[in-house]
Amino acid sequence: MKRVFIMLAIVLGSAGLLFAQKSNQKEVKQLQSFLQQKSAKGDANYIRLGITDIKNPAMWKGVVWSDGRAISIDWKDKELAGELDLNGFTALQKVDCSRNQLTEINVSNCTALNTLNVSRNKLSELNIDNCPALVKLDCYKNRLTDLSL
């Protein structure tokens, strides 16, 4: 039984190390920056998401990774707040951050992004420059004064 447990620990530890080596560090740092910002409830965004280890992207709830790149973010209705910078996430295909209190989101240069839902936030501007794959955009119930296409 001890051997099985030790082998399992080694295998799982190796998988986490492999993910850390393969992951796009720029994307990880940008997401970590947002996760550490204050949520609408006053604690950190990562706490609202139930994330216990901010240094382990493989365990982040709501983020789907493929080949070390974020391809989907689903953080709908989590009482998140602050500024989410996804600029340059070229593998990202879908984002749903609706029903939060985001004040800014930047998805420019997300060339694979096809679906973006940022409805019911506190956005005053939205930059979706160079998002040629975008076919669905929901941004109603914000405070938009500027939409950059």
Locate predicted features:
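N-terminal capping/linker segments that flank leucine-rich repeat
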Residues: 2-94, 111, 132
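Short intrinsically disordered, low-complexity coil segments enriched in acidic
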Residues: 65, 145-149
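Consensus "Asn ladder" position of solenoid repeat domains
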Residues: 78, 100, 118-121, 139-142
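Conserved LRR concave beta-strand detector
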Residues: 72, 83, 91-96, 104, ...
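Residues on the solvent-exposed faces and adjacent turns
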Residues: 99, 109, 130
